[in-house]
Structures are given as C-alpha cells and as structure tokens.
C-alpha cells in the first residue's frame, strides 16, 4: 500500500537531505522522516490503513491519524514531509491554517475510542480519516481543497506557487514589533 506513494515520497525528498528511514517494529512497514534527528514524522501501513504519528525524540508507533484513502494519505505526506523539505532547503515556511473543519465539508462522528473521531468528506465519502483533533489533522483537511498536484508543486516551489503563496510565513511582522519596542536590529542603519 505505501508502495503506491513511493513516487510522491521520492519527489518531495529529492535534492534534500531529509532523512527517510525504514520503520518496522512489528507495527507494519513504513518510513520515518526527520531533518536533524528530532521531530520525527512516521508513516506506515498496517492492516489496510495508512497510519501517521509525530514525536520529538524517536519514531513512534502511537498513531495520531489513520486512513484507508490514498489521496488523503498523500495530503498528509505532502504537508508534513514538504515542511521538512522547505526547512532543509532554508525556504520560507508555508503555514497551513489549522481551523476546525467546516461541517459543510466534513462530517464528524464518534468512534469506539474516546478522543478519536471519524472525519468524512461531504463531497467524497471515500475520503475518511480517524484522528484525534490535532493541528496536523486540521491542516490536512484544509489542504484537500487544493488539487493534489498543485499542492505538491507549491511545496516544491520556493515561492509556494501555484496555490500556497498566500500562506508563506514572514518574519517581518515580528521584526517590526521588535523595532517598535526599541530593539536595534543588525539591518537597521543605527545598529
């Protein structure tokens, strides 16, 4: 199953040193990604599901999100590994909004696990994900409004074109607040 996403993974990791390590600890087969051996993102397949987890110190088998839908899995991979790619290439980060999903776009149902909900697309009932209500989930659901190919291309492009340029972050507002507070910065004439 994860083999279907190999080409996508290869494209996102191309021309970078984003580490892709095999992950197989009795929890299925997959990959763990990191930039500097911190902040691991792990993707694996198990029993017909794509599963995803995030952890700080080492890859974790405690999944936060799972889906059977290849397209939804692709959006998760692009968002998470694409962010690692941009950081490694020292490109401006893309800040994907993390608002709660709209009831017009996603239905939310309880599962047998207390903190886990099932999110189903109202336009494509095959797009189903079970997850805790995490920022990563909300970013993934937001991302599905864009065509997948355009979404991938935006993470590959330094200016985040064609669809994500409005979500590029900037340090300028932070620097302006520092200047307003009287902090002299190296770029100031009077530094």
Would you name each region that the model predicts?
Residues 78-103:
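Short arginine-rich
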Residues 58-69, 129:
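A short, exposed loop/beta-hairpin motif centered on an aromatic-Gly-Thr core
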Residues 1-49:
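N-terminal "first-domain core" detector
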Residues 99-191:
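Intrinsically disordered, low-complexity, charge-dense segments enriched in Lys/Arg
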Residues 30-32, 40-42, 51-53, 76, ...:
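Ordered hydrophobic segments in well-structured contexts
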Residues 3, 7-18, 78, 82, ...:
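Generic surface-pattern signal
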Residues 68-81, 137-148:
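A short, charged, amphipathic alpha-helix used as a generic interaction element across diverse proteins
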